[in-house]
Amino acid sequence: VLFRSIVGTKTDYFGIPILANILTGANGFSEVWGTKLELLWYYFKLLILPWPLSWDYSYSEIPVMSLSHPLAWISMVLHAGLLAFVFLRFRKQPFLSFAILFFLVMMAPTNNFFIYNTTTLGERLMFVPSLSICLALVFIAGKLTKTDWKLSAPLLQNNSIKILLPVILIFSIMTISRSADWKNNLSLFKSGVEVCPNSSRTNYSLASEYFKQAQKTGNDELKKEYLQKAGQLFQRSVEILPENYQDRK
């Protein structure tokens, strides 16, 4: 990944619109690296607390950020600390060190730090890296309850389950709640605008869906309402990103 980033540094962003990846709108060393560190922070946040969620995080929900912003430094210290822990504690804490290293390595190809891609931030890119938090939670639960994982014991009699079950329950409820947003395009795009109101794409997509609904309905009042909402959202999308070609069609 590092070699690919060095070789492709000058061409990785070629042809990628700012609507897809905000890094193409970053100018100079400070903005490029400040924004990269900002994205690392958001990916870490998704790992620890994946709520609220959106199907899209494009321009300008996540703004271009310079190195003068505190969040960039917080992210830098955080990730430097994670790397330091891996190298300094690997022999004494191999399980937790592996979990951290797994997260960092699995995120490397898609988090825009080394290689630009066509997504500013994507929850789907966390599918494999999220295994790291599962490993870390098992380790932490075992430490808190002084569980010896080498000893075989019935699962429900394991003290660590007292910690893990509530966590599993909470995240299961969050998953079920989030799944409701995926009922159809209208519900999904509505939730996208609610969570990411500053994304040109979420506004455009909901506007397009309202326009489609207006064409389908036979109710004149409802059609008028849908078209009015579509117009407002199209306007908002253009305000966020005037060069969004989709809204000019």
Outline where the language-model segments fall.
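Polytopic membrane enzymes that build or remodel cell-surface glycoconjugates and lipids
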Residues: 1-248
